[in-house]
């Protein structure tokens, strides 16, 4: 029976790996022939979106960086409070439950919520800042929970040694705990960025579809995911769709590999 179960587990692992390899191979085979410098740094032209995707790359980087700047301070401060200052009880458990529930909200729901709140109610319009605020809500629970776990993983004896030398609570947190947990915190941030880059529904409802180079946070734009969705959905230029998919996949895989590198480096 042990050999049978071992075979079942091994088959499940192989199937998972083969599915991933098949997806990557399919995208690479169809997308690689269309990748060039003109495609990466050019502008879409005409109704068939011929040319390149440079404005969509800029929009993706812009909105993701803005979302990270909004999310990270809030998530880290909340995690520090939960791990170091808050008394464990029902309130803290409620906050953790709310964070976990927020992480499970479908992106389409978050997109509609972002449109209703940021675009309409707050009057920010279809813009980078509207999309960044909505993406920050998706990133927040990932960074917060990862940071809290990273802080709790710092050995207690390090804190006790600092207290024994006369350090204050804030000095221990800022000078010892957070630097010790930095690797895992950075891993959580990188994973959250990877998820934000791959989101479509949220940015579709909050940023719009305009093909331009955004300068102000109030400018609209078209990220790579929305560009890919429009190309594939309308079937107007599947070559550009496969090329965009390949670049997007490479970016997300690079962030995931970087997160694994940070995690292993700090062990």
Question: For each of these PLM feature ranges, what is it?
Answer:
Residues 1-15, 259-267:
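Transmembrane alpha-helical segments of polytopic membrane transport and secretion proteins
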Residues 100-138:
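Generic hydrophobic transmembrane alpha-helix motif, especially the helices
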Residues 106, 165-166, 179:
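Glycine/proline-centered hinge or cleavage motifs at structural transition points of membrane proteins
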Residues 68, 146, 169-205:
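Transmembrane alpha-helices
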Residues 47, 51, 203-249:
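Interhelical loop and adjacent transmembrane-helix boundary motif
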Residues 67-99, 112, 120, 259-264:
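Transmembrane-helix boundary motif in ABC transporter permease subunits
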Residues 1-11, 27-67, 230-239:
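Periplasmic/extracellular loop-to-transmembrane helix junction in inner-membrane transport proteins
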Residues 148, 152, 156, 163, ...:
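C-terminal transmembrane helix and the adjacent membrane-cytosol boundary/short C-terminal tail
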């Amino acid at each position: 029976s042990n050999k049978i179960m071992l075979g079942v587990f091994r088959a499940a692992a192989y199937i998972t790996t083969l599915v991933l390899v098949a997806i990557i191979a399919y995208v690479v085979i169809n997308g690689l022939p269309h990748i060039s410098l003109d495609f990466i740094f050019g502008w879409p032209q005409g109704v068939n979106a011929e040319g390149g995707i440079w404005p969509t790359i800029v929009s993706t980087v812009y909105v993701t960086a803005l979302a990270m700047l909004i999310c990270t301070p809030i998530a880290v401060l909340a995690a520090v409070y939960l791990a170091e200052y808050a008394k464990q009880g029902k309130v803290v458990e409620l906050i953790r439950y709310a964070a976990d529930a927020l992480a499970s909200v479908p992106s389409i729901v978050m997109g509609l919520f972002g449109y209703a709140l940021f675009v309409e109610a707050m009057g920010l319009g279809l813009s980078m800042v509207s999309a960044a605020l909505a993406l920050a809500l998706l990133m927040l629970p990932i960074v917060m929970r990862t940071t809290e776990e990273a802080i709790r993983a710092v050995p207690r004896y390090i804190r006790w040694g600092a207290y024994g030398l006369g350090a204050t609570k804030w000095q221990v947190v800022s000078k010892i705990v957070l630097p010790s947990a930095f690797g895992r915190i950075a891993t959580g941030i990188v994973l959250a960025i990877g998820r934000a880059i791959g989101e479509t529904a949220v940015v579709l409802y909050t940023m719009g579809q305009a093909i331009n180079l955004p300068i102000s946070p109030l400018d609209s734009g078209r990220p790579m995911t929305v560009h890919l969705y429009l190309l594939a959905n309308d079937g107007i230029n599947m070559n550009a769709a496969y090329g965009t998919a390949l670049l997007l996949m490479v970016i997300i895989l690079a962030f995931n590999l970087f997160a694994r590198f940070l995690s292993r480096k700090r062990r």
